[in-house]
């Protein structure tokens, strides 16, 4: 049998159903954002407190599991519940789209009742096989779904950018492998896509659904591949075509007065958000229509249906306008501290060396972030890596060599050569240059038991007098710094955003790509600060600014300094609107 092409879907068809789909999106958003997320966070925090720990990180998770097995089991159950919430969200949106394709005249209330009733029935029929397949499809095979539809908990499952950057820098073949794998997964997603509709709408088992999809796409793989790809491309083209006149009008208005430019900016922000949801609607209905072979029709409407549609859209526009005012009017409420990562900027030298510090200090960063480790003889050396082979060619840990042996070693990076620097020399040079440091204490199992006690006794007074700050991945370091002098700022580094920590640290140094508004909102209820790393692009800068980061650790000081100046002194609303619109393309 000849396969069917996707049904046509016009703007008028979307418009006459916009109240329903907008209401569905907003209801889902409100339930997740204002009901489940706060509840989940409170429960997770309560359970974590029962373990006696103040935070959850890679270096204490094993201790939590072994020390509090029942609480750990409860936390695991909470993870499962979160996955079920994501599963329900997927089902709700797809079932909502399917009900729009039903050729029945329904009010908004009738539509909502039927969608939720069927969604709860869908949850009652959940099996491990179904949830595994649907998550695998949405997360791995066709991740466009989870990104476009903003499935919160699935979007939280990400590889932090610092790991991605490291792998790309060290292993260039990975990029080729990932590209090949992505193409392979897309092909598999085409072969399996009709299994999705069978599981969501037809109550089939995974085995039956997969068999059905493989049979349906057999001998027609290229046809379905092209049409699935075309649905995605048309969704983005649809959004871009609506976006162009908005940005063009804003660019013209930006040359006039601030007030006129801001007013149009807010209006355009509202339009962008509405067009964003219209594009989401287009993708969702088009995709479900392609899976089911059903077509969205324009059914006769009562006059009050128009009022209902405009009422829903009006409420959405008010919400978007408030969001737009905050976004456009105060892009940088407080200037963030700009911090050089490992004492270099734009590869201007070898990391953590006195020579690079002298160069970097000329760029006037607020702080220079450095890495310090203990040596075999109980001294302190400037070194980031646990094994120094990559920088020095010597296969050893800093704790295996004395300070004298380490400082004799040549160190090479970015085409520059130097000697390994001692912390004493580095600190003295920083004080001489009046350059403040953010000193990261890196710990290892080879450290002496009294390492931090000796470090603070030797350097604590000097650090405080010169305004230096400290940070560490090891919370024992935080405790000992605060015990020595609570007025020395010390930040706790968290490489992944999970359960909100309740520590005594001055603040947190977070990997930016996993950071979200929920973490920041909780932080605002404390007097703690937020540093983010590593900010090397305009995208990461924008995210950090709008989350209200107090400090940004970067490998490119001049770029971030320029971004801060523009954001504070001459924010172009056209640029801000463009960046907001680009979130639709953020993968």
Question: Model segments located where?
Answer:
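Hydrophobic alpha-helical membrane segments
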Residues: 1-338
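Loop/turn elements at helix/coil->beta-strand transitions in domains of secreted/extracellular proteins
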Residues: 222-223, 364, 432-436, 465-467, ...
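Membrane-interface segments at or immediately adjacent to transmembrane helices
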Residues: 327-382, 389-391, 395-400, 405, ...
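Hydrophobic faces of well-ordered beta-strands that scaffold small-molecule active sites
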Residues: 338-341, 368-370, 437-441, 468-471, ...
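Conserved, mostly hydrophobic/aromatic
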Residues: 341, 360, 371, 406, ...
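Active-site-proximal loop/turn and secondary-structure-junction residues that shape catalytic pockets
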Residues: 344, 374, 387, 443-445, ...
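Metal-dependent phosphodiesterase/phospholipase catalytic core, i.e.
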Residues: 384-487, 580-586
């Amino acid at each position: 049998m000849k396969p069917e092409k996707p049904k046509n879907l016009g703007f008028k068809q979307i418009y006459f159903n916009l109240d329903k789909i907008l209401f569905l999106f907003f209801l889902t958003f409100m339930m997740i954002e204002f009901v489940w997320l706060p509840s989940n966070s409170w429960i997770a925090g309560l359970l974590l407190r029962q373990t006696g720990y103040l935070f959850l990180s890679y270096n204490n998770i094993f201790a939590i599991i072994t020390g509090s097995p029942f609480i750990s089991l409860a936390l695991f159950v909470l993870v499962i519940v979160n996955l079920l919430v994501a599963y329900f969200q997927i089902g709700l949106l797809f079932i909502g789209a399917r009900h729009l394709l039903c050729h029945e005249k329904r009010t908004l209330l009738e539509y909502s009742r039927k969608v939720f009733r069927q969604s709860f029935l869908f949850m009652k029929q959940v099996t491990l096989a179904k949830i595994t397949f649907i998550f695998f499809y949405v997360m791995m095979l066709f991740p466009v779904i989870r990104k476009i539809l903003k499935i919160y908990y699935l979007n939280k499952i990400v590889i932090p950018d610092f790991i991605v950057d490291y792998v790309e820098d060290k292993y260039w073949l990975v990029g080729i492998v990932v590209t090949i794998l992505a193409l392979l997964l897309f092909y598999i997603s085409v072969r399996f896509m009709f299994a999705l509709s069978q599981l969501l709408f037809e109550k089939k088992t995974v085995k039956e659904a997969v068999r059905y999809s493989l049979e349906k796409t057999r001998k027609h793989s290229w046809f379905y591949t092209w049409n699935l790809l075309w649905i995605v491309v048309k969704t983005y083209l649809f959004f871009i075509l609506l976006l162009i006149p908005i940005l063009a009008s804003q660019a013209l208005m930006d040359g006039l007065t601030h007030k006129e430019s801001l007013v149009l900016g807010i209006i355009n922000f509202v339009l962008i958000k509405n067009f964003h949801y219209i594009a989401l609607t287009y993708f969702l209905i088009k995709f479900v229509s392609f899976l089911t072979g059903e077509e969205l029709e324009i059914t006769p409407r009562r006059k009050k249906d128009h009022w209902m549609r405009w009422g829903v859209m009006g409420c959405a526009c008010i919400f978007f306008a408030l969001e737009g005012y905050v976004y456009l009017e105060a892009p940088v409420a407080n200037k963030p501290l700009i911090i050089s990562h490992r004492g270099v900027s734009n590869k201007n030298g070898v990391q953590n060396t006195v020579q690079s510090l002298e160069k970097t200090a000329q760029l006037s960063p607020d702080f220079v972030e450095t890495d310090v480790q203990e040596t075999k003889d109980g001294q302190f050396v400037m070194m980031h890596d646990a094994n120094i082979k990559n920088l020095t060619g010597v296969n050893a840990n800093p704790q295996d060599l004395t300070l004298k042996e380490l400082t004799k070693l040549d160190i090479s990076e970015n085409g520059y050569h130097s000697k390994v620097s001692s912390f004493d020399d580095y600190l003295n040079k920083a004080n001489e240059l009046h350059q403040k440091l953010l000193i990261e204490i890196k710990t290892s199992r080879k450290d002496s038991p009294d390492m931090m006690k000796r470090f603070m006794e030797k350097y604590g007074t000097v650090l405080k007098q010169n305004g230096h700050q400290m940070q560490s991945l090891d919370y024992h370091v935080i405790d000992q710094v605060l015990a020595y002098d609570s007025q020395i700022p010390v930040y706790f580094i968290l490489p992944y955003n999970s359960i909100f920590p309740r520590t005594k640290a001055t603040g947190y140094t977070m990997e930016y790509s996993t950071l979200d508004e929920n973490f920041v909102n909780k932080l605002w209820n404390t007097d703690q600060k937020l540093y983010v790393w590593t900010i090397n692009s305009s995208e990461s800068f924008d995210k950090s600014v709008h989350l209200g980061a107090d400090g940004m650790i970067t490998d490119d000081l001049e770029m971030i300094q320029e971004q801060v100046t523009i954001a504070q002194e001459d924010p172009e609303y056209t640029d801000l609107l463009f960046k907001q619109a680009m979130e639709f393309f953020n993968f």
